[in-house]
């Protein structure tokens, strides 16, 4: 049981997460006396933990507290699929995954993590760089703490790979009955084959970059991948790298009015660089039903006045739940 104070706090968190895209910029106010303790509780059948990053690794000093938290979702009463959904938020995201998506995934039997990582600098600030490897250097720095580049100076304890490793170990140790240890190999390394990497905007690009380095179960990109060089008038060079994860395990959903990072025609060039076009047909999610012809690419045409609203629509509007379920669960040959 959780006390009424924690119950009220959890419900305020869920309400805040349900506000489209605001979850990436505005945090629900937390009681200061909660300190570094992880908020725990069961909301609508979903067990939720909020974890202070430094509790998982004492070396962590940055992007820690003051809104920066890791999150974990799971449904105890649902058959465990043995797959871990790892959510990487976009620029200025502080770790909280979208509530509707996370609760849906948990109720489908997935374990879900939201990771707090260094996300304050937009990757799109590099789109005018003459360095064709600029996008890759920045992402490699954030993910692996390698290749310091410009404003990207990630310390090793703060990089995505290290934080994810320590978070899974922390949950396996402190929540031993929840099955987090199944996502670790006998030697303690992450079992990438069980991971589904999900990212929005900047986080979607990180998910793809990581999938090229590690063979993951699948990748879900929302409002991504967006790395397009305005200087060279072409997609990021790293899209052409060999990938450890096959093409048929990559999914993307970008609204046609989304101009964040790149225009929609430039988005299509990114798909071609990755290889998703012409391999797959782009399906309009607003006008289609599962199984969507087996595609890996989605768009939408619901009109918006602002590009940012279109950018958020694929992952922050519950009308897309059928698409989310398809992307998570459609069989892969």
Model-flagged regions — what are they?
Residues 185-199:
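Alpha/beta-hydrolase fold nucleophile elbow
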Residues 30-78:
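N-terminal cap/lid segment of alpha/beta-hydrolase-fold proteins
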Residues 99-114:
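Short amphipathic alpha-helix adjacent to the substrate-entry channel of hydrolases
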């Amino acid at each position: 049981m959780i006390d009424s104070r924690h119950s009220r706090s959890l419900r305020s968190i869920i309400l805040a997460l349900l506000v489209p895209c605001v979850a990436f910029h505005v945090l629900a106010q937390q009681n200061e006396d909660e300190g570094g303790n992880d908020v725990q509780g069961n909301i609508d059948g979903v067990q939720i933990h909020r974890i202070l990053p430094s509790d998982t690794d004492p070396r962590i000093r940055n992007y820690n507290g003051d809104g920066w938290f890791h999150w974990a979702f799971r449904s105890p009463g649902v058959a465990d699929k043995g797959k871990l959904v790892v959510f990487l938020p976009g620029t200025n995201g502080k770790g909280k995954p979208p509530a509707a998506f996370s609760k849906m995934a948990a109720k489908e039997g997935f374990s879900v993590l939201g990771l707090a990582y260094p996300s304050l600098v937009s990757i799109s600030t590099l789109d005018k760089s003459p360095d064709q490897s600029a996008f890759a250097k920045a992402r490699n720095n954030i993910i692996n703490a390698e290749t310091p580049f410009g404003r990207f100076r990630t310390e090793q304890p703060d990089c995505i790979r290290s934080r994810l490793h320590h978070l899974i170990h922390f949950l396996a140790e402190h929540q031993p009955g929840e099955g987090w240890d199944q996502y670790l190999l006998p030697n303690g390394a992450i079992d990438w084959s069980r991971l589904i990497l999900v990212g929005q905007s900047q986080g979607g690009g990180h998910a793809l970059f990581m999938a090229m380095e590690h063979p993951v179960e699948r990748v879900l990109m929302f409002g991504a991948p967006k790395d397009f060089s305005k200087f060279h008038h072409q997609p990021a060079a790293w899209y052409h790298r060999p990938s450890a994860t096959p093409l048929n395990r990559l999914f993307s959903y970008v609204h046609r009015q989304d101009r964040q990072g790149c225009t929609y025609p430039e988005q299509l060039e990114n798909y071609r660089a990755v290889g998703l076009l012409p391999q797959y047909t782009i399906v309009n999610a607003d006008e289609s039903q599962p199984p969507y012809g087996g595609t890996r690419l989605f768009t939408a045409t619901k009109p918006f006045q602002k590009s940012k609203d279109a950018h958020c629509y694929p992952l922050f509007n519950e009308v897309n739940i059928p698409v989310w379920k398809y992307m998570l669960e459609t069989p892969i040959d």
